[in-house]
Design a protein with these regions (language model features):
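Ubiquitin system architectures
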Residues: 1-87
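Protease-labile, long low-complexity intrinsically disordered regions enriched in Pro/Ser/Thr
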Residues: 85-329
Length: 329
């Protein structure tokens, strides 16, 4: 049976993921399913199957169908559109006394849409500039436990979102807000560390950003499989945090009554090759940061987080954390 070589051009939203480069997949047969091609891509690039959309001749390919059924032949070119995921933004409400009625809403910009919401809530479209909005109505007690009208109790409000097909943007929008479909993780805005230094550094950074022990534990356990996968590839980890004012324009958080302090900690991270090999021509070459230099960075100041306000246990406060792995670094 003839074997097929497929050249994939990688796209994130509307731009090439790697300029001028295509992944060449060998060992693919006409009888191979779309699912098996995605599995090969996942093994080669770490991109989860669930976040891949394969496009051929303007048509999205379905997992169970074979390449032959789509008339994909030798040297065919597929586009792989990546769905980036904003992982587990969790909203905590902290109050010294019970508040009977609290309304919490999140409204997303057009670049992404809700994939998971918990507690369950109805989505609504709020404006032409937004994909959707969700609102929760809860009470909060002095221990931070949230209660719905049904009496069910929760530790936090949870939402997760996936990026959508690209939409036109004007320059002002692009440079003044976080764009979930085009997250920016560069050598100039991030810290690069090997895994064995990174984990302790991240734990310390989260503590400085005023996440409680419970929040830090949830954060680390949620992202640890991704960090371990990067380590197992022999790569280092680049990390940055999104400025709060920019993130607010991509995911507007509204809380009534208004807390005295609202903190939104959203991490971007990705795998990078910092080795000094001749074939490594990336911007990350030799860019591992000394741990002492990394420890000197004041992330709270960089992202505009009010540390003093968060420490005031006499006040009503809100804390949200989340993150996103960036694959085109």
């Amino acid at each position: 049976m003839p074997r097929v070589v497929i050249f994939l051009s990688w796209l994130t939203a509307d731009r090439l993921l790697v300029e001028g480069r295509a992944w060449k997949l060998g060992g693919i047969k006409p009888s191979s399913t779309v699912q098996s091609v995605k599995a090969f891509i996942q093994a080669s690039t770490r991109m989860p199957i669930s976040q891949q959309r394969l496009i051929f001749a303007g048509r999205q390919l379905e997992n169970p169908i074979t390449l032959a059924e789509y008339n994909i032949t030798h040297n065919s070119v597929l586009n792989c559109v990546i769905r980036l995921v904003g992982g587990k933004p969790a909203i905590y409400l902290l109050s010294p006394q019970a508040i009977n009625k609290v309304s919490v809403s999140v409204e997303l910009s057009r670049e992404w849409d809700f994939a998971v919401i918990y507690p369950l809530a109805d989505k609504s479209q709020n404006s032409k500039f937004s994909t959707s909005k969700v609102t929760w109505n809860v009470s909060v007690d002095s221990t931070g436990i949230l209660r719905e009208a049904s009496g069910r109790e929760y530790s936090y409000l949870f939402w997760e979102a996936e990026t959508q097909p690209a939409t036109p943007m004007i320059d002002d929008e692009m440079y003044n807000r976080f764009n979930a479909a085009r997250p920016i993780l560069t050598s100039s805005n991030s810290v690069v560390l090997p895994f064995h230094d990174f984990i302790g550094y991240l734990e310390m950074t989260l503590e400085r950003l005023q996440l409680t022990v419970s929040m830090r534990t949830d954060f680390m356990t949620y992202w640890m499989p991704n960090f371990l996968h990067i380590r197992d590839q022999g790569l280092d980890i680049a990390v940055t945090f999104v400025e709060q004012s920019m993130f607010n324009k991509a995911a507007r958080l509204s809380i009534t009554p208004q807390p005295s302090t609202v903190a939104r900690v959203f991490m971007l991270f990705g795998a990078v090759d910092t080795t000094d090999r001749d074939e490594n021509d990336s911007e990350w070459r030799n860019l591992r940061l000394d741990l002492k230099e990394a420890n000197d960075i004041d992330w709270a100041m960089r992202i505009g987080l009010d540390v003093k306000g968060l420490k005031d246990q006499r006040a009503f406060r809100a804390m949200e954390w989340g993150g996103m792995e960036v694959y085109d670094v």
